[in-house]
Amino acid sequence: MELLFLGTGSGVPSKGRNVSAVALQLLEERGATWLFDCGEATQHQILHTSIRPRRIERIFITHLHGDHIFGLPGLLGSRSFQGGETPLFVYGPAGIRSFVETALAVSGTRLKYELYIEEFTEGVIFEDEQFIVTAKLLDHGLPSYGFRIVEKDLPGTLLVDELRALGVKPGPIYQQIKRGEVVTLDDGTVIDGRKFVAPPKKGRMIAIMGDTRYCEASVELAEGVDVLVHEATFSANEAHLARDYYHSTTVQAAEVAKRARAKQLILTHISSRYQGEMCDQLVEEAKTIFPNVALASDFSSFSIIRKGHDER
């Protein structure tokens, strides 16, 4: 599981940063990539990475400002032109369906794969046997959402060495034991399967925020996550601009991470006014509140390692 930032700027593209898009690489988990937002030229950014468009399985849109959606129609078309045939799911606030369908229709773009567009409000917007994704409304003037992505706990591994020490040979009985069943061996020995399975492996948790002012919904979404991705459009001394334009400062993002007890904070959506050493200053501002901070640049990647069952 890896976060790969494709665009980390705010508002409009700049020489150093493209507009918003971040990929959640789930290649080991499900052979797929999920995309969060798709600003202008996202597909061009993808060309500089190992991401294969046909492996993009789901796209989650935080809100309908252009710097978060203008790259979507082009990416959908290119995915088809490049041989993508598997279904693609797009999730977004009300209006995303009209935007996508109109862009594809007016441009005469025909897709070779099934496209499913789901408009959501708050609550669980996706769940399967591996993951659950929850959305909450943030504070950005027009509807902007944050996402909490939770990997479900994995079953514990079978304690094979302990079974072999008891003379239990590999075979179908191992599956029974792994399911926690009580089994009786040929010699009458009773095996309680629950005692021969390691504790479950704790799933990983990520929170990815759309554009927002500091708000309680961000704290709730980020509760206990391994990684919080939060916008930091402005420096701490420009809180008045953050308030007026419905954005956050570095310190406000750090406050969310601290209150939520997140393990790591990654800052993104950085104004082009901050260059070079000024970006280092943004990190230092956040660290006065929350120590484990990184500032994302385009093509930054962050691995999210699964901890042991006793590391919560």
Swiss-Prot record:
Any idea which positions bind Zn(2+) 1?
H63, H65, H140, D211
Gene Ontology molecular functions: 3'-tRNA processing endoribonuclease activity; zinc ion binding
What this protein needs as a cofactor is: Zn(2+)
Please provide the record's keywords in A-Z order: Endonuclease, Hydrolase, Metal-binding, Nuclease, tRNA processing, Zinc
* Superkingdom in the source lineage: Bacteria
Q: Which InterPro entries match?
A: Metallo-B-lactamas (IPR001279), RibonucZ/Hydroxyglut_hydro (IPR036866), RNase_Z/BN (IPR013471)
Q: Which residues form the active site?
A: D67
Q: Which reaction does it catalyse?
A: Endonucleolytic cleavage of RNA, removing extra 3' nucleotides from tRNA precursor, generating 3' termini of tRNAs. A 3'-hydroxy group is left at the tRNA terminus and a 5'-phosphoryl group is left at the trailer molecule
Its job: Zinc phosphodiesterase, which displays some tRNA 3'-processing endonuclease activity. Probably involved in tRNA maturation, by removing a 3'-trailer from precursor tRNA.
Assembly, in brief, is:
Homodimer.
Record protein name field: Ribonuclease Z
Species the sequence originates in: Anoxybacillus flavithermus (strain DSM 21510 / WK1)
What is the phylogenetic placement of the source species in the record? Bacteria, Bacillati, Bacillota, Bacilli, Bacillales
Corresponding gene?
rnz
